[in-house]
Amino acid sequence: MDFISSLIVGCAQVLCESMNMAERRGHKTDLRQAITDLETAIGDLKAIRDDLTLRIQQDGLEGRSCSNRAREWLSAVQVTETKTALLLVRFRRREQRTRMRRRYLSCFGCADYKLCKKVSAILKSIGELRERSEAIKTDGGSIQVTCREIPIKSVVGNTTMMEQVLEFLSEEEERGIIGVYGPGGVGKTTLMQSINNELITKGHQYDVLIWVQMSREFGECTIQQAVGARLGLSWDEKETGENRALKIYRALRQKRFLLLLDDVWEEIDLEKTGVPRPDRENKCKVMFTTRSIALCNNMGAEYKLRVEFLEKKHAWELFCSKVWRKDLLESSSIRRLAEIIVSKCGGLPLALITLGGAMAHRETEEEWIHASEVLTRFPAEMKGMNYVFALLKFSYDNLESDLLRSCFLYCALFPEEHSIEIEQLVEYWVGEGFLTSSHGVNTIYKGYFLIGDLKAACLLETGDEKTQVKMHNVVRSFALWMASEQGTYKELILVEPSMGHTEAPKAENWRQALVISLLDNRIQTLPEKLICPKLTTLMLQQNSSLKKIPTGFFMHMPVLRVLDLSFTSITEIPLSIKYLVELYHLSMSGTKISVLPQELGNLRKLKHLDLQRTQFLQTIPRDAICWLSKLEVLNLYYSYAGWELQSFGEDEAEELGFADLEYLENLTTLGITVLSLETLKTLFEFGALHKHIQHLHVEECNELLYFNLPSLTNHGRNLRRLSIKSCHDLEYLVTPADFENDWLPSLEVLTLHSLHNLTRVWGNSVSQDCLRNIRCINISHCNKLKNVSWVQKLPKLEVIELFDCREIEELISEHESPSVEDPTLFPSLKTLRTRDLPELNSILPSRFSFQKVETLVITNCPRVKKLPFQERRTQMNLPTVYCEEKWWKALEKDQPNEELCYLPRFVPN
């Protein structure tokens, strides 16, 4: 039995071994086939890799680079290739050992089985990589488009803007569209190029980075071509825009892209071009530059950044970098002239670069003197300035109408860096005939609208105040160049304001001129005989040394429309003014005239007569005004007050009265001065005039206890400026009971002077809806007034002046102020001036502080011990305090570490 059992076991072992040998031989056969398949597959994968690498290298020459997806695929191929190479080495080593002894076969069989499984895994990976390669080939091209690095000139002074833009382009920022705007030549393209290069050199999170250089002629079809070319797309020239848009959309929809559009002139419908609109889900961005903030709005820019002019320091650095010759600028005389040239550029980079290059080889002081003189008088003649002007002309030509272009050119009549009152500017435009009343449209509002267009086009800037505008130096030079037919007819304009002239230009220089502006000089005399057949505009205002106008001065100015003699020292008007039969606008405000000549009535087309602040004006004959049937504006604020002094003598003309004004059918704006209570009572009787009163000065109305302002001024709806002086019995102003929340809605300036019995300003409380347009309040010599708490929530109040009010104890009464800090307190206040307020204890209750005040002037207010500002940890937007040094040093400090905080800037006065 043992023998049989042993035999059975032995047979079973032999049979089992035979079966294992057969299985091992099968594995060996499968492994060899798998190795062959692996070698073929890896070879094919290498070929695909080599083709892709070649394409990347070729596209790299065009400024393109490998996409993140392609880069990951190439990395995976390299890993797979390494694994394959190692496995093939192991297989070949095993093949060399196949002749070894039989006892190793079982071991080899096990190892071959494991090796076969690894081969299968690698083959599977290779298959997946091949599938991914197909997706990469059709995914907007095998490589993704990027901007190539753009060579740019040195960048000066835009570091802060760079940081702002890069922050916007960061992953955390959800807003998708940024509009960068500013005037031509200010550096928008340079900023965009710097951003482009920064992203390329330091890396970014976008799959696709596309730069498109726009122009005025670019349409949506052209944008499609530019974007399509950058994406590597191709299409037939006859293919429709819709099909092209679809291709672009398919190429971009799964990508995170950044589209950079430089110099956009017209609104672009991104979706119509096929570019997906950026949103917080796709995290894409579109950034564009333009010269118009209006276009930023039309394009849906969620973030708008204005590229500002360079500060003086950076402007000097840029200019010097173009001159190159440091030794040249070390000469004090040449440096002084260079600084004049730089100042004329007004921080405009293009002008600085152009003029710096033009002066680089000028070594003598005489050359620099000549350059500064030419730049002052005829800047277009400076080398390179024609290029600067050509760039600005694009913006000029792009204005929507000839009306806008005329209004723009008119702004050049004022001095460099001069802030122009918007309302005054619009009044000139009306006088010139640019604006006319039609269909009930208010011409002043229309003028504001046009100024908004010019500001949006970056051709005008906001002035020193919100109510003002100004024109950049270089833009002004360009405007004068355009006004003279691009320098061809210089004799058409004689514009020399603020030049320091003591003599007027010679008579022959006036003959061909259409426009003459000699304002703000020191001219003492004018030519005796002038023939100006084409002259339409003459500005002589602010020549304080001018005391007389020659008798026949106006005889030969037959088409003159605008004449401004304001703030000269003239004492009389020559009778030759009667020849100005085309005159529309006449300003003699601030002059020393005492009589209006009767001949003024001959100016039948006159619409605007400004005589405000002519305090010496005593006589206005009826015939000087009554014949002016087209008169719309008559301003006698702080002026003539002889309303009830009509004379009927044989040798004396009857004087102007209130009744005469009612016959001026076109009158819309009236400025009135009243110097007696009787006159004030008389004015109350002429109800038809009340709606026209916009400027009112009341003085010396003694026995007037309460001033019923609403009854006099049509509930105050149109009153814009109110001045009350030396009405010693006045206690307060009466406000309408039936207009609790809507009285004096147009009032902008309030002046109260020498009202010794005034205990409060208004008869009832002031809500936020009242006085909603008041900008400036001046109160002086009102010795019974305790506070001005009513001013605290006026939404547009910018300036408060309190002078010599002996009993004022606080600006805001403690019991009339909110119990906690209120952000609506003084929401717009910028300037506070106080002087000679001996009882003033505090400017604000201790729990409050000014948030937006920029200037505080305190003189002789000894009881004030604390500034109404919070200490700040940064120097940004610190207010300036003008005060006595002794008072400044005595200020109370609440915290022992206050010296670590930034206090307001101190300026001794």
Swiss-Prot record:
Residue intervals of the NB-ARC domain: 135-440
Chain sites annotated for binding ATP: 182-189
UniProt keyword Transmembrane helix, yes or no: no
Phenotypic consequence of residue 653 to V: In strain: cv. BG-4, cv. KNO2, cv. Po-1, cv. Wu-0 and cv. Zu-0
Pfam families (alphabetical): LRR_14 (PF23598), NB-ARC (PF00931), WH_DRP (PF23559)
Annotated GO MF terms: ADP binding; ATP binding; ATP hydrolysis activity
Coiled-coil blocks: 29-58
Keywords tagged on the record: ATP-binding, Cell membrane, Coiled coil, Cytoplasm, Hypersensitive response, Leucine-rich repeat, Membrane, Nucleotide-binding, Plant defense, Repeat
Chief place where the protein resides: cytoplasm
A single GO cellular-component term on record: cytoplasm
Function: Disease resistance (R) protein that specifically recognizes the AvrRpt2 type III effector avirulence protein from Pseudomonas syringae. Resistance proteins guard the plant against pathogens that contain an appropriate avirulence protein via an indirect interaction with this avirulence protein. That triggers a defense system including the hypersensitive response, which restricts the pathogen growth. Acts via its interaction with RIN4, and probably triggers the plant resistance when RIN4 is degraded by AvrRpt2.
Protein name: Disease resistance protein RPS2
Organism, as annotated: Arabidopsis thaliana (Mouse-ear cress)
